[in-house]
């Protein structure tokens, strides 16, 4: 499983979904899907824009959790 930490990053800065969408140029639905961890796939350009906006690395935004650790 891949966990997205977008909600944490946004919470630390008290940002709303629309704020991130406006600043990054990403569609609101894309940001919302990542925020709610419902995204099934994410384009590299979206990851790049989010990393630039939050000044973070991909590993700060996403975390791989092996299936055995979920139990």
Named regions from a protein language model:
Residues 1-16:
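A short, Lys/Arg-rich alpha-helix, primarily the initiator
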Residues 6, 20, 31-34:
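Conserved hydrophobic/aromatic packing and binding residues within compact polymer-binding modules
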Residues 8, 33, 62-71:
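Short, charged recognition helix plus adjacent turn
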Residues 10, 21, 51:
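The alpha-helix within a helix-turn-helix
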Residues 26-41:
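Recognition helix of helix-turn-helix/homeodomain-like DNA-binding domains
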Residues 45-60:
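DNA major-groove recognition helix of helix-turn-helix/homeodomain DNA-binding modules
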